[in-house]
Amino acid sequence: MASAPTSKYNSHSLENESIKRTSRDGVNRDVGETLPRLPGEIRITDKEVIYICPFNGPIKGRVYITNYRLYLRSLETDSALILDVPLGVISRIEKMGGATSRGENSYGLDITCKDLRNLRFALKQEGHSRRDMFEILTRYAFPLAHSLPIFAFLNEEKFNVDGWTVYNPVEEYRRQGLPNHHWRITFINKCYKLCDTYPALLVVPYRASDEDLRRVATFRSRNRIPVLSWIHPENKTVIVRCSQPLVGMSGKRNKEDERYLDVIRETNRQVNKLTIYDARPNVNAVANKATGGGYESDDVYHNAELFFLDIHNIHVMRESLKKVKDIVYPNVEESHWLSSLESTHWLEHIKLVLTGAIQVADRVSSGKSSVVVHCSDGWDRTAQLTSLAMLMLDSFYRSIEGFEILVQKEWISFGHKFASRIGHGDKNHADADRSPIFLQFIDCVWQMSKQFPTAFEFNERFLITILDHLYSCRFGTFLYNCESAREKQKVTERTVSLWSLINSNKDKFKNPFYTKEINRVLYPVASMRHLELWVNYYIRWNPRIKQQQPNPVEQRYMELLALRDEYIKRLDELQLANSAKLSDPSASPSSPSQMMPHVQTHF
């Protein structure tokens, strides 16, 4: 990692950077063109502060606080700096120093962010400036604690594409060839009474009645019964997801659950066994028996094979990411980098998640066996495994729209607890439910995109933009824990979808090397020597670390694509003009060669 001198430090997301460049298109500015504002964004206050920059030292600036962001612009001519931080990114706000503090810049605020950076501001001790800033930031960064709406409900942005229409479950299952004579669509969960964390529409075995489903639900954690996620277009094997069975210490059984899994097995008669992947380490699954959970024993589920994938729980992942932050922010120790990275175990966890997904995909595609995937409750590791396996198996999900559908389906509609894992608008930064499960998934996708650079329609900016708005609270896409809660809060009616932003600006998020391929299965190499830390995400706030610059070939290719599009547009305009003249009898006849100048597209 090479160091680079820097005279200008812009600490904001890629997406926010694009806002500044296109501020004439819907982003208001006030206070002498210093503050960008979204429609619905209101300026609350501004103060002069000293920003304790961990890279360039103390910098005098003015900080503006709105109901959406903290925005700082330096007042020093020799140090141009901008900080643009959505308040949803803030995890914790602490006061530093006391009334008797005498050290230089020792009195102010410490701000911890969810996107791996910290901010420190020094303020004057007189005039209650710290108290005022602390109270305002706390009020708008943690609106739920103050009976205020999350900004997404105040955002008045308009886009020419409605992102809420991207995912229609009926259309997505129809794309997969469902329903068929083995699988049916049921609306038994229409009012979320069968399972309050599942979507309203489910795909289940044709031979299983709704009453069977109710009986199975009593034996699955949180009533999360086995339901279909994906079906192979050729061999008709399926990926089914669910939660753990409620076996308990006494080894309870449920005949309906056993028969139900057998029915799933019989929808595909190419193999005699149903494969069950339990995402947990074996010891954890056994320990869960003490709290009423457990796993499918071979002694009971005779026609099933059980494999444990050794992926650790949310608490282990949270601690691992904390260690990553410790080694990447604010400074990177070059001399001990490899050992420091290894000590975080982050890439080990990425490896285990990818390895598990590869096993699922391979068993379905090559092994021709249907698989059931679960962890404890089926909304964390299960979502990682099913969505990554589907990404490997189905090229549709590797397009921009397909990936959006994958996230909407496997993560959002099936109840990954975004509110609990991220803590949108919640001041309880130490909540044990916080965990970077979705970040891990996106990291795995990035690892795949590095190994298969032509297989994905989207680029790195697309993935980083998704992660930025996982925290920002600008859009309603990731709010709440489940579909029933979103319906209750009318999220699709009252907020804007992140996919509206992305699909209105698709060219920014396209991979120029994308080659569309049908039915190509991707098997990434999940060994430690093929995995790497995502520098452009985890270390992007450090201006001394040289970021991975766009490939010159990629830049030239993008220029040629833009040139081609311009030529095609001109050609269409000329053809339209020619048609109009041909249809006008009063117009003088012109030969095609006169009307159509020679256009060469370089392709």
Swiss-Prot record:
Myotubularin phosphatase domain span: 163-538
Biological process annotations from GO: endosome to lysosome transport; intermediate filament organization; mitochondrion distribution; mitochondrion organization; muscle cell cellular homeostasis; negative regulation of autophagosome assembly; phosphatidylinositol dephosphorylation; protein dephosphorylation
What membrane topology is annotated for this entry?
Answer: Peripheral membrane protein
Job of this protein: Lipid phosphatase which dephosphorylates phosphatidylinositol 3-monophosphate (PI3P) and phosphatidylinositol 3,5-bisphosphate (PI(3,5)P2). Has also been shown to dephosphorylate phosphotyrosine- and phosphoserine-containing peptides. Negatively regulates EGFR degradation through regulation of EGFR trafficking from the late endosome to the lysosome. Plays a role in vacuolar formation and morphology. Regulates desmin intermediate filament assembly and architecture. Plays a role in mitochondrial morphology and positioning. Required for skeletal muscle maintenance but not for myogenesis.
The biased composition feature labelled Basic and acidic residues covers 14-32
Q: What residues sit in the active site?
A: 375 (phosphocysteine intermediate)
Swiss-Prot/TrEMBL keywords = Cell membrane, Cell projection, Cytoplasm, Endosome, Hydrolase, Lipid metabolism, Membrane, Phosphoprotein, Protein phosphatase, Protein transport, Transport
Q: What is known of its domains?
A: The GRAM domain mediates binding to PI(3,5)P2 and, with lower affinity, to other phosphoinositides.
Q: Where in the cell is it found?
A: Cytoplasm; Cell membrane; Cell projection, Filopodium; Cell projection, Ruffle
Spell out the subunit comment. Answer: Heterodimer with MTMR12. Interacts with KMT2A/MLL1 (via SET domain). Interacts with DES in skeletal muscle but not in cardiac muscle. Interacts with SPEG.
Ranges annotated as biased composition (Polar residues): 1-13
Q: Which residues form the GRAM domain?
A: 29-97
Q: Where does a 1,2-diacyl-sn-glycero-3-phospho-(1D-myo-inositol-3,5-bisphosphate) bind?
A: 288, 313-314, 376-381, 417, 421
UniProt-recorded name of the protein: Myotubularin
- Catalytic activities: a 1,2-diacyl-sn-glycero-3-phospho-(1D-myo-inositol-3-phosphate) + H2O = a 1,2-diacyl-sn-glycero-3-phospho-(1D-myo-inositol) + phosphate; a 1,2-diacyl-sn-glycero-3-phospho-(1D-myo-inositol-3,5-bisphosphate) + H2O = a 1,2-diacyl-sn-glycero-3-phospho-(1D-myo-inositol-5-phosphate) + phosphate; 1,2-dioctanoyl-sn-glycero-3-phospho-(1-D-myo-inositol-3-phosphate) + H2O = 1,2-dioctanoyl-sn-glycero-3-phospho-(1D-myo-inositol) + phosphate; 1,2-dioctanoyl-sn-glycero-3-phospho-(1D-myo-inositol-3,5-bisphosphate) + H2O = 1,2-dioctanoyl-sn-glycero-3-phospho-(1D-myo-inositol-5-phosphate) + phosphate
Instruction: Give, as one word, the top-level EC class.
Output: hydrolase
Record family assignment: Belongs to the protein-tyrosine phosphatase family. Non-receptor class myotubularin subfamily.
Q: Which positions carry Phosphoserine?
A: 13, 18, 588
- Binding residue positions for a 1,2-diacyl-sn-glycero-3-phospho-(1D-myo-inositol-3-phosphate): 288, 313-314, 376-381, 421
Q: Which PANTHER family match?
A: MYOTUBULARIN (PTHR10807:SF69), MYOTUBULARIN-RELATED (PTHR10807)
Question: Could you tell me the superkingdom of the organism this chain comes from?
Answer: Eukaryota
Q: Which GO terms describe its cellular component?
A: cytoplasm; filopodium; late endosome; membrane; plasma membrane; ruffle; sarcomere
By its UniProt entry, which InterPro entries does this protein fall under? GRAM, Myotubularin, Myotubularin-like_Pase_dom, PH-like_dom_sf, Prot-tyrosine_phosphatase-like, Tyr_Pase_AS, Tyr_Pase_cat, Tyr_Pase_dom
